[in-house]
């Protein structure tokens, strides 16, 4: 007894192919910046006496950035693969989702950058490369969607 022969009417599985060309310039900047931000969270953000700590270790609230970054990357990747898009009937548009998410990430990363860990006895804490990479990546991810809004509010 074996398995039945495949029927001639069987539908072939659709091929899932990541199409980078389907992404516009804004999506590439938002997605690329967010991917670099995600990676930077695991890099050394602060150093003290030769020891370094990651952004996630120094500031637990950066786990929010980690989760939001995964959501942004997932949304853009799902659209590039063609498996899912934000429904047109949604009350919030795709761009609104990305604006809120990238702005939240930027604000939290800026706060983490400015609030170096320390306190009593830790006056020598300095920034390390991960903090700069993370801040620049958060700016790159938020800028393409945020700048037009800023310009419109200024009346330009």
Give residue spans per PLM region.
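Compact integral membrane and secretory-pathway proteins
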Residues: 1-156
């Amino acid at each position: 007894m074996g398995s039945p022969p495949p029927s001639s009417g069987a539908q072939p599985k659709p091929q899932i192919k990541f199409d980078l060309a389907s992404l516009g310039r804004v999506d590439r900047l938002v997605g690329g910046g967010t991917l670099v931000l995600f990676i930077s969270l695991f890099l050394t953000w602060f150093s003290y006496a030769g020891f370094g700590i990651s952004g996630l270790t120094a500031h637990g609230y950066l786990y929010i950035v980690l989760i939001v970054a995964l959501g942004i990357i997932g949304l853009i990747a799902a659209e590039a693969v063609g498996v899912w898009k934000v429904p047109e009937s949604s009350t919030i548009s795709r761009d609104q989702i990305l604006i809120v998410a990238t702005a939240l990430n930027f604000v939290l990363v800026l706060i983490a950058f400015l609030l170096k860990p320390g306190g009593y006895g830790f006056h020598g804490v300095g920034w390390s490369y991960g903090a700069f990479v993370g801040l620049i990546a958060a700016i790159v991810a938020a800028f393409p969607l945020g700048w037009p809004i800023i310009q419109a509010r200024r009346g330009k």
